[in-house]
């Protein structure tokens, strides 16, 4: 696995536009409802987390693997949401990148995340 394209649908009782992504995911009512992904251009798979389905282990592992490039439209949102999801549901697999100088800690490293929204702005 070299690339994974990701799209999520989420819910929170916190207004994203008023409070931003960090407060949005910190709500105890935050949840990821749907997790869509495609590995290396293969067929899209959709995991209905709200219906009790689980993300496959190889995909969970890929989320913390910096050698796997993660692609998403507005990847910052996906990265922060998935960080919170991993922290809650897979704490044994969650790896944060925080350094002492970082004021926003406990999130997945942005190193291997690519934003298609940003890339499309250059086209």
Residue map of PLM features:
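Conserved DEDDh/DEDDy metal-dependent 3′-5′ exonuclease domain
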Residues: 2-5, 10, 15-19, 23-123
